[in-house]
């Protein structure tokens, strides 16, 4: 097949390829509108006509006042009739789908809000606040839990055996403590605490008896002076000195006589 490399053949081939086929998909807005010169209400940013008799108008180029404003030129009603209400189509449709997904078949309004609240309460039940009560400050202390440890009530048999063991040994080993606890049907901790308290009591009793003994001895000694007292020896020595001063010794009298004779 001979090929032609002339300019005319190449131009005609390119023009034939540029023609759109008959089965091409329709444009984005396949609505017939008047020619561009008849649209006086469109903004300057409106899209230009790509084909004869068709106009692709971008929704962003047409303002809301031009679509929903007062009637103006005769071309504006034609434009509104040609295009669907894209504002409601693109804005309210997703919201409608959301409401239908949440509560299908329920109308909007106070009834819908009440139905939604009832549905929420059934899905997430809340406890009744009347079930809970608060304890006032003035209430008795018996209602509050006590933080003190419960005292162990020992029987007379247990106390007798514990006292007997304490008299023989004040300090127990762990094995002996376990034996006593098993024999008296007590826990090891109870036996340990009892012996600790008993040792403290024993020390207090010993200190009290020592104080009483020391006080009684001091009170008894105040009646009569003990033997070897310094005050008694001093008093006897003073009495002997007084007795010696009363008679005159012969040695002293002779000395005085000699002194009298010597003097002229």
Curated annotation (Swiss-Prot):
Compartments where found: Nucleus
Keywords, alphabetical: Activator, Developmental protein, DNA-binding, Homeobox, Nucleus, Transcription, Transcription regulation
Alphabetized CDD domains for the sequence: homeodomain
Amino acid composition bias (Gly residues), ranges on this chain: 211-225
Alphabetical list of Gene3D superfamilies matching this protein: Homeodomain-like
Major location (coarse): nucleus
An individual GO BP term: central nervous system development
Residue span of region SNAG domain: 1-20
Annotated signal sequence range: none
Region: Disordered, residue numbers: 201-264
Start-end of Low complexity biased regions: 229-238
GO CC entries: chromatin; nucleus
Cited function: Probable transcription factor that binds to the DNA sequence 5'-GC[TA][AC]ATTA[GA]-3'. Activates the transcription of the GHRH gene. Plays an important role in pituitary development.
Protein family per UniProt: Belongs to the Antp homeobox family.
Protein name, as recorded: GS homeobox 1
Species, as recorded: Homo sapiens (Human)
Upper lineage: Eukaryota, Metazoa, Chordata, Craniata, Vertebrata
């Amino acid at each position: 097949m001979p090929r032609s490399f002339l300019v005319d053949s190449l131009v005609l081939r390119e023009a034939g390829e540029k023609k759109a086929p008959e089965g091409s998909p329709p444009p984005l807005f396949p609505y017939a509108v008047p020619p561009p010169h008849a649209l006086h209400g469109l903004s300057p940013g409106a899209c230009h006509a790509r084909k004869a008799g068709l106009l692709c108008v971008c929704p962003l180029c047409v303002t809301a006042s031009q679509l929903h404003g007062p009637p103006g030129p005769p071309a504006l009603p034609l434009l509104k009739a040609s295009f669907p209400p894209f504002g409601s189509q693109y804005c309210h449709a997703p919201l409608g789908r959301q409401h239908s997904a949440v509560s299908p078949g329920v109308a909007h309004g106070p009834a819908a809000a009440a139905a939604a609240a009832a549905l929420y309460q059934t899905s997430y039940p809340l406890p009744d606040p009347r079930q809970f009560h608060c304890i006032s400050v003035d209430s008795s202390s018996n209602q509050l839990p006590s933080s003190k440890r419960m005292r162990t009530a020992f029987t007379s048999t247990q106390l007798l055996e514990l006292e007997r063991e304490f008299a023989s040994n004040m300090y127990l080993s762990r094995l002996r403590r376990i034996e006593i606890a098993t024999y008296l049907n007590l826990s090891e901790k109870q036996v340990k605490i009892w012996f600790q308290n008993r040792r403290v009591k024993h020390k207090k009793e010993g200190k009290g008896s020592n104080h009483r003994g020391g006080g009684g001895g001091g009170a008894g000694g105040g009646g009569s002076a003990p033997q070897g007292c310094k005050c008694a020896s001093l008093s006897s020595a003073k009495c002997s000195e007084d007795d010696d001063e009363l008679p005159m010794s012969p040695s002293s009298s002779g000395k005085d006589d000699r002194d009298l004779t010597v003097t002229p």
